[in-house]
Amino acid sequence: MDEEIAALVVDNGSGMCKAGFAGDDAPRAVFPSIVGRPRHQGVMVGMGQKDSYVGDEAQSKRGILTLKYPIEHGIVTNWDDMEKIWHHTFYNELRVAPEEHPVLLTEAPLNPKANREKMTQIMFETFNTPAMYVAIQAVLSLYASGRTTGIVMDSGDGVTHTVPIYEGYALPHAILRLDLAGRDLTDYLMKILTERGYSFTTTAEREIVRDIKEKLCYVALDFEQEMATAASSSSLEKSYELPDGQVITIGNERFRCPEALFQPSFLGMESCGIHETTFNSIMKCDVDIRKDLYANTVLSGGTTMYPGIADRMQKEITALAPSTMKIKIIAPPERKYSVWIGGSILASLSTFQQMWISKQEYDESGPSIVHRKCF
């Protein structure tokens, strides 16, 4: 496909929006899924102040803005802001006219049906796209890893899910969803840093904590042992410089924060950890295909980027699975973007071209067409 009519691939995450052209090997635009509105009255006349800012611009002016994320737990909760993000994606980031390109969007599995209908409606009615499609995120990650069978543990900023896929088909009865992901870990880190005497409260300060989390946190192979090490020596301590020059020290918080993925009780949640959720998902599948799932456990999404997470998953799942089972955790280095990469692969396949929902089909059937054409 030439640049002229290349499909646009937009992976709208709860935390980051990844967008680009089908056939590319990486997204052209990656920006925070944030809409910011001024907290104060504008007094400077003629400054061209806007009533809202999107993405990086909102991030850089965060000190004077209230930041809102229109996507929570993978579900769009604020459609007006979502439209702003899409508008920004097409016109400011990719600089394309959406009415000239087919658009591939992504969504979390087990999302409410109304959510994808509304996505479809906005694409056709507001942006006048000639064609569109909604794909499930985890399935795209598996495409990106070059497999058709495996179980994907996809964890982003807003939602984590485990999706078993066999010969290219997602097994809906075995998909499990966990509303515990990056944003919850950021909030938890804010809380445990407060216990150390560092107070982070505003929406802007939360972004600083997110940066600390991304730069310094890791998953311990053995949590209890790591806690003992942290208590007896300062070898695990790291320092971080805040935007105002103040330096803070962070110790056991570095691994206590992501430990909540394995022990959600840290957050006061009753759910199972990501290792148990993955195991339960496999156990809901037919006994004959479990072996293939254990041997192809693929990690995807930004919240799987912690150092040590693959080894820990290997250890935890080995403890749960039958003792003779071969277990392999696949953690591709580009897993932060694997959903997008999978979308880029899918949208450029010649066999996929008949799968698009066209404007004509939409006009005939309305938004519900999305349930028939996208599965």
Swiss-Prot record:
Alphabetic keyword roster: Acetylation, ATP-binding, Cytoplasm, Cytoskeleton, Hydrolase, Methylation, Nucleotide-binding, Oxidation
Modification sites for Methionine (R)-sulfoxide: M44, M47
Enzyme superclass (EC): hydrolase
Tele-methylhistidine found at: H73
Reaction equations catalysed: ATP + H2O = ADP + phosphate + H(+)
Residues recorded as bearing N-acetylmethionine in the entry: M1
Post-translational modification remark: Oxidation of Met-44 and Met-47 by MICALs (mical1, mical2 or mical3) to form methionine sulfoxide promotes actin filament depolymerization. Mical1 and mical2 produce the (R)-S-oxide form. The (R)-S-oxide form is reverted by msrb1 and msrb2, which promote actin repolymerization.
Annotated localization: Cytoplasm, Cytoskeleton
Modification N-acetylaspartate occurs at: D2
InterPro entries per UniProt: Actin (IPR004000), Actin/actin-like_CS (IPR020902), Actin_CS (IPR004001), ATPase_NBD (IPR043129)
EC number: 3.6.4.-
Single GO molecular function: ATP binding
PROSITE patterns noted in UniProt: ACTINS_1 (PS00406), ACTINS_2 (PS00432), ACTINS_ACT_LIKE (PS01132)
Keyword Cytoplasm annotated: yes
CDD domains found in the cross-reference section: ASKHA_NBD_actin (cd10224)
Cellular-component GO terms for this entry: cytoskeleton; dense body; focal adhesion; plasma membrane
Keyword Iron-sulfur appears in the UniProt entry: no
Main localization of the protein described in the UniProt heading: cytoplasm
Taxonomic superkingdom: Eukaryota
PANTHER family: ACTIN (PTHR11937)
Further details from the record: In vertebrates 3 main groups of actin isoforms, alpha, beta and gamma have been identified. The alpha actins are found in muscle tissues and are a major constituent of the contractile apparatus. The beta and gamma actins coexist in most cell types as components of the cytoskeleton and as mediators of internal cell motility.
Family of this protein: Belongs to the actin family.
Function: Actins are highly conserved proteins that are involved in various types of cell motility and are ubiquitously expressed in all eukaryotic cells.
Subunit annotation: Polymerization of globular actin (G-actin) leads to a structural filament (F-actin) in the form of a two-stranded helix. Each actin can bind to 4 others.
Protein known as: Actin, cytoplasmic 2
Organism this protein belongs to: Xenopus tropicalis (Western clawed frog)
Gene of this entry: actg1
